């Protein structure tokens, strides 16, 4: 029970830590963007214990699905498992703490290439009904998507926040201010994580001061509301983008195979023509060289020349 209590306290303490300044919050989001498939509390605890993590999974998944063994002495990342009646701990390991064995493989981690950005931009514009003014660049589109998604679910994510605000800095703020600040913080946080995972620089549109109100969420009880909003919305959009990137990459690979096959076919035909030309030239050369009409190696009967006995 003591270890479970330690992790609960770690979550509380780290929530205060990452909300203590805009830079600390951005540091947390750098980790969360890489691990967007995890819920907020898991992201928070992973950042507290292994901030450089890139791909985390259970020991069983690494061993049985990926055929990767966890390194001797590696420390598991403790997470809170609250799915059952009683909260318990579960452990995950980052890929950096594993190594491949025979038949092992690495997880697929999609990466958006620069030449794919235009197609992703087109997809986002169609999927989210973006206006033309929001499709100048991929960064513009991601900001518009973040703004739209937060606005659509704002009431859901704010529900209950006023009751959790007791004893926090939010307690002294009026409802309109809390609502406005939450909406802006959530939008900017979603945008930040989308950009980070897509390989873009979020600070081209943002400034550090845009996250100044994060310090009002100085306890886990209220930070969870903001964290859940940013995490869940980011996950939804990034899953969509990831699938689109994968689809584009598969199509590019298919075209490359077709081009390669066509190139090989053309090379094969060229080689056949060249070989035929060489054979024709060879026949002409043999027929025009000295000796008999049958060349120098064959007798008139078509066999090898009969050797004369040694004298």
Protein language model annotation of sequence segments:
Residues 1-276, 283-284, 289, 294-311:
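N-terminal accessory/interface modules of nucleic-acid-binding and processing proteins
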């Amino acid at each position: 029970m003591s270890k479970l209590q330690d992790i609960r306290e770690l979550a509380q303490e780290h929530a205060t830590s990452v909300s203590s300044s805009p830079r600390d919050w951005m540091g947390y989001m750098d980790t969360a963007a890489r691990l967007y498939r995890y819920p907020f509390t898991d992201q928070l605890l992973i950042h507290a214990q292994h901030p450089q993590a890139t791909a985390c999974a259970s020991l069983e998944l690494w061993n049985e699905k990926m055929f990767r063994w966890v390194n001797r002495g590696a420390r598991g990342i403790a997470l809170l498992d609250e799915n059952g009646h009683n909260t318990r701990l579960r452990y995950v390991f980052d890929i950096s703490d594993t190594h491949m064995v025979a038949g092992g493989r690495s997880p697929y981690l999609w990466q958006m290439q620069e030449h794919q950005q235009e197609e992703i931009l087109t997809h986002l514009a169609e999927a989210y009904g973006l206006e033309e003014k929001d499709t100048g660049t991929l960064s513009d589109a991601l900001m518009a998507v973040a703004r739209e998604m937060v606005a659509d679910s704002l009431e859901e994510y704010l529900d209950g926040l006023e009751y959790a605000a007791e004893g926090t800095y939010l307690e002294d703020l009026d409802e309109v201010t809390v609502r406005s600040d939450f909406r802006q913080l959530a939008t900017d946080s979603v945008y930040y994580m989308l950009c980070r995972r897509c390989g873009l620089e979020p600070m081209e549109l943002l400034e550090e001061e845009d996250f100044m109100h994060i310090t009002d969420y100085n306890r886990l009880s209220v930070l969870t509301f903001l964290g859940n909003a940013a995490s869940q919305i980011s996950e939804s959009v990034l899953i969509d983008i990831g699938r689109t990137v994968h689809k584009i990459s598969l199509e590019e690979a298919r075209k490359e195979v077709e081009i390669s096959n066509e190139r090989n076919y053309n090379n094969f035909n060229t080689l056949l023509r060249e070989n035929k030309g060489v054979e024709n030239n060879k026949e002409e050369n043999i027929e025009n060289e000295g000796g008999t009409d049958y060349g120098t190696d064959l007798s008139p009967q078509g066999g090898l020349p009969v050797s004369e006995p040694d004298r």
